[in-house]
From Swiss-Prot:
One of its GO terms (molecular function) is rRNA binding. InterPro entries: Ribosomal_uS11 (IPR001971), Ribosomal_uS11_bac-type (IPR019981), Ribosomal_uS11_sf (IPR036967). Located on the platform of the 30S subunit, it bridges several disparate RNA helices of the 16S rRNA. Forms part of the Shine-Dalgarno cleft in the 70S ribosome. This is Small ribosomal subunit protein uS11. Pfam families: Ribosomal_S11. The keyword Protein biosynthesis does not apply. HAMAP family: Ribosomal_uS11 (MF_01310). GO terms for biological process: translation. Part of the 30S ribosomal subunit. Interacts with proteins S7 and S18. Binds to IF-3. The gene is rpsK. Keywords: Ribonucleoprotein, Ribosomal protein, RNA-binding, rRNA-binding. The lineage of its organism: Bacteria, Pseudomonadati, Campylobacterota, Epsilonproteobacteria, Campylobacterales. It comes from Helicobacter acinonychis (strain Sheeba). GO terms for cellular component: ribonucleoprotein complex; ribosome.
């Protein structure tokens, strides 16, 4: 009889990182939160869609807040105490995500940067909606 292949889950190695960088990507459809160390190696991540928000609920400020809280709770397990914030995009969850990082206990915000790419008359924007 053939052996069954049993999938084994990789063990998450707990790192001891004091400082991290929180990348907030706030699009019109979703909010992605990625936490890295200072070198850019990913520690943990979370998205509004990954937390169970589907459809238009993913783009709400509440979903962005929940995504930040989820990512920071994972990052605290790795010892993150001080963070810098890099924000990209102009979605509705942008401001709420920044505020909820600052409101989280045990995490000190050192700096905030906006890394949204600005085009100098680049691609043609999508046509206007007709409702």
């Amino acid at each position: 009889m053939a052996k069954r292949n049993v999938a084994t889950k990789k063990k998450v190695v707990k790192k001891n990182i004091a400082r991290g960088v929180v990348y907030i990507s706030a699009t019109f459809n979703n909010t992605n939160i990625t936490i890295t160390d200072e070198m850019g190696n990913v520690i943990c991540w979370s998205t509004a869609g990954g937390l169970g928000f589907k459809g238009s609920k993913k783009s709400t400020p509440y979903a962005a807040q929940q995504a930040v809280e989820s990512a920071l709770s994972k990052a605290k397990e790795h010892g993150v105490k001080e963070v810098g914030i890099k924000v990209q995009g102009s979605g509705s969850g942008r401001e709420t995500a920044i505020k909820s990082v600052g409101a989280t206990e045990g995490v000190k915000v050192l700096w905030i940067k906006d890394i949204t790419p600005l085009s100098h008359n680049g691609c043609r924007p999508p046509k206007r909606r007709r409702v």
